[in-house]
Amino acid sequence: MEHKAPLVEFLGLTFNLSDMLMITITCLIVFIIAVAATRSLQLRPTGMQNFMEWVFDFVRGIINSTMDWQTGGRFLTLGVTLIMYVFVANMLGLPFWLDVTVNFGGNRRPTDATVTLTLRDGRRPHHYYGVKMKGASDYLRDYTRPVAWLFPLKIIEEFANTLTLGLRLFGNIYAGEILLGLLASLGTHYGVLGCGSIPMMVIMVWQAFSIFVGTIQAFIFTMLTSFYMAHKISHDH
């Protein structure tokens, strides 16, 4: 039986309740982690505070690798928010993959292109800060550097970078979901034959690999966002 995600029409717009639920849960988890890690700060961090400081240091390293800290320090909060949201969204549903798939018609929200393409709109501040920090004239001249005939290619690059930022996350996570579905079907088939333990072991190994891929994708998404920001605000480009 085919399971479809619940849809609701409101003011001419279609809302996917599965997406809305999982996005809300993801945001709540990130918010709870942030509050739990910062509500009683200590000079010697332990537990959740230690974890949160590690995340901040990690994102600080990402920013430092793409731009100088004096310029990029203002984007630290953005980077931490992105990496935590994408990571939690990728992990959400892994322990209960079958239940979530059956009940909600979906799993981790990065498997929905609508969500990942919305996340890629995080590139919009790039243009704002590019104009603010370089000036409108200097910012626009970047599209004709080093030679004017590159202008059409620079426009294509803008759309390509924006599109691939979201589709890369969607494609990698969605491919993992498809393979998990195939392995689950394989487990059901061999379970009937009395050999279900072997496919289930394969599923567990693939789940572990999915955790690795989800973590890497959160890093790559944050790294590329920082890189694109540096590309827009740096005077070297």
UniProtKB/Swiss-Prot annotation:
HAMAP family associated with the record: ATP_synth_a_bact
One Pfam family of this chain: ATP-synt_A
Organism: Bacillus caldotenax
Top-level taxon of the source organism: Bacteria
Protein name listed in UniProt: ATP synthase subunit a
Role noted for this protein: Key component of the proton channel; it plays a direct role in the translocation of protons across the membrane.
Matching CDD domains: ATP-synt_Fo_a_6
Family statement: Belongs to the ATPase A chain family.
Keywords: ATP synthesis, Cell membrane, CF(0), Hydrogen ion transport, Ion transport, Membrane, Transmembrane, Transmembrane helix, Transport
Top-level taxonomy: Bacteria, Bacillati, Bacillota, Bacilli, Bacillales
Gene3D superfamilies xrefs: ATP synthase, F0 complex, subunit A (1.20.120.220)
